[in-house]
Amino acid sequence: MNFHILFCSSRHVTIELDEDAIYETASYEIWVNGRLKGVFHRMIQTIDGLLPDTDYEIMLVRANEASDTVTFHTEPEPITLNVRDFGAFGDGVHDDTSAIQAAILCCPKNARVLIPKGTYPVTALFLKSDMILELQENAVLAGIYDRARTPILPGQIEYDNEDGYYNLGSWEGNPIDSFASMITGIHVKNVTICGKGVLDGRADFENWWSRPKDKIRAWRPRMIFLNHCENITVVGVTVQNSPAWNLHPYFSNQIRFLDMEVKGPANSHNTDGCDPESCTNVEIAGVHFSVGDDCIAIKSGKIYMGKKFKVPSKHIHIRQSWMQDGHGAVTVGSEIAAG
């Protein structure tokens, strides 16, 4: 049996088996430096609990068959910033937005912001470049439904000394005011979001999914919104109960979604799984989708955006994923004016 390293960070490695199976295969063991890490059955699997800047050997075993040993070296990581040290409670009651945001803003280059076990109510968090955001197992970022407290991303802000506008918010293919997402990236690069934790929007029919066709202050947020971002990897986490689309990379490049769960009720409104819009080099691999709209919808804006920017979506690579519930597995559009 053969495999290769799909992704490696400071504390995680993701492997992909080189077999003909789709999403799942016969059970196999993963051994790291001679120690059993567990028995697994998915074609793409992430192993955590590694140390930064360290050499490792990994081998797979199935019955009497063993793979070749593959060596890898984890990325360096200068420091960990624990959000509890910045005042986050993680008790499911206090609003932990400002404490977690402070940790993100203080994070030095290539360091880790750690969210340990607990439930952390938040509105919107804004990423910065060159960082790792890790949600440990049983760590939950829990969405706060409060339109008055959630930041708005303006759709169009006119430039002072030149023609055109600065576009931050987007809704269904147009530059329109929208609420900032639980995880928002604006012009950031080199970010990893990882771990076994959960991003839970806590949307239901009493809040965000009520009156889905109405703009109330702004249009509904996504769970992860990446606007003009580059080299972003999301691996291992579960994303669920989104107010609208779950994963929305927008005019971005080199975006990876690996070994994830994306979930929402089958009757939830506009909860697309992953909608790359005017993006290049997007990889979606080992993702389990079960949502209330299209699992994956490739987009490039409505007619206005298509004519103005002429940025198509291209080089979108999708494999080893399970589309369970959803209106469509992989769709093109709507909102595909730029191709």
How does the language model describe each region?
Residues 1-339:
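Extracellular/periplasmic carbohydrate-active domains that bind, remodel
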